[in-house]
Amino acid sequence: MEGEGVQPPDENLENGSRPRFKWKKVLRLVVSGIKAAGLLLCVVYVCLQFSSSPAKDSPIQRLRAPVTGCEGGRLFIGTSKNEYETMEVQNNSVIINCDGLYLIHLKGSFFQEVKINLHFRKDRSPIFVPMLNNGQRVVFTVVTSLAFKDEVYLTVNASDTLCEHLQINDGELIIVQLTPNGYCAPERPYSSTVNQVPL
């Protein structure tokens, strides 16, 4: 009766280690399955991205224009159109044709203290542009979300000078679209001003 119910030490170790070994094996299988499923999802995602072609490859919207004066309470945005600029200026406003995030950078020096506000959407309040050197210098950069039909323009106010008499040195406005995959309005067809005579 001495040895009944008591197993030799080797058998105890073997029986005790088997369940732990099974759990480790099951855990490894589960982790491998999760990794395989994740890899499969990544491959499917990449394949879908390559197979879906964008509806229209529109150029990145960008503008670099001189700011040379003031007209009707707005800073005058000059037009220096070149092949790399894709945005249009109308009535001292930059017209936004494509949705996305845009970087807007303004710099310049004034001979008097001014206050400048950046406007871009009718239902939004303007962004106050902080000034340097007692309100006579601006170096301002902001990233904001703009959409089709928005108009970017700058209003200026000087306490003792009329808008038309403001003097600006080295004024420049740069607008660059950072995310070019949003909606873009179709480009307007070229309209010729030449009179056409029927044949």
From Swiss-Prot:
Q: Where in the cell is it found?
A: Membrane
Name assigned to this protein: Tumor necrosis factor ligand superfamily member 4
GO CC entries: cell surface; extracellular space; membrane
Task: State the organism of origin.
Answer: Rattus norvegicus
Chain ranges of the THD domain: 59-176
Q: Which residues are glycosylated?
A: N91, N157
Q: Does the keyword Zinc apply?
A: no
Q: Which GO terms describe its molecular function?
A: cytokine activity; tumor necrosis factor receptor binding; tumor necrosis factor receptor superfamily binding
